[in-house]
Amino acid sequence: MSIKTIEGTLEATNLKFALVVSRFNDFIGQKLVEGAVDCIVRHGGSEENIAVYKCPGAFELPAVAKKAALTGRYDAVITLGAIIRGSTSHYDVIAAEATKGVAQAGLETMIPITFGVLTTENLEQAIERAGTKAGNKGFDAALAAIEMVNLYRQV
């Protein structure tokens, strides 16, 4: 008896994506969008199959992601943004709720919804993760979305 391993491929040809990005910390969000688009195109996707939805902040990401998933127009939804710690507990609340909300939206819709939202201690860390020293987490979130779409199709 052999164990069958099933994995998603990294092929984005003909896949349709919704990118839901927070406008708060917009400079970082735009860099994450650029990384996600780059990933999709490098893996055979086209810019014509990508829609970008901008919402006010990270707290609103789950609702817009769920609504986009429920339209049936997209194979996957990629959430992007940056939550940067400040001097109050607001960061902790927003980071927890955005993370939980995006995960819940994915479970409720059964459409792959990936989390490309940076949660950093400072702006420098966010910049590093949006395309400089630590790669681009938007690219990583798009790669996960591509793989998940192709895995879902085999389950």
UniProtKB/Swiss-Prot annotation:
Protein role: Catalyzes the formation of 6,7-dimethyl-8-ribityllumazine by condensation of 5-amino-6-(D-ribitylamino)uracil with 3,4-dihydroxy-2-butanone 4-phosphate. This is the penultimate step in the biosynthesis of riboflavin.
EC number in record: 2.5.1.78
Protein's name in the database: 6,7-dimethyl-8-ribityllumazine synthase
GO cellular component: cytosol; riboflavin synthase complex
SUPFAM superfamilies: Lumazine synthase
Signal peptide location: none
Gene expressing this chain: ribH
Species the sequence originates in: Chlorobium phaeobacteroides (strain BS1)
Binding site residues for 5-amino-6-(D-ribitylamino)uracil: F24, A58, F59, E60, A82, I83, I84, F115
Any one GO MF annotation of this record: 6,7-dimethyl-8-ribityllumazine synthase activity
Example of a GO biological process term: riboflavin biosynthetic process
Annotated metabolic or biological route of this protein: Cofactor biosynthesis; riboflavin biosynthesis; riboflavin from 2-hydroxy-3-oxobutyl phosphate and 5-amino-6-(D-ribitylamino)uracil: step 1/2
Enzyme class: transferase
Chain sites annotated for binding (2S)-2-hydroxy-3-oxobutyl phosphate: S87, T88, R129
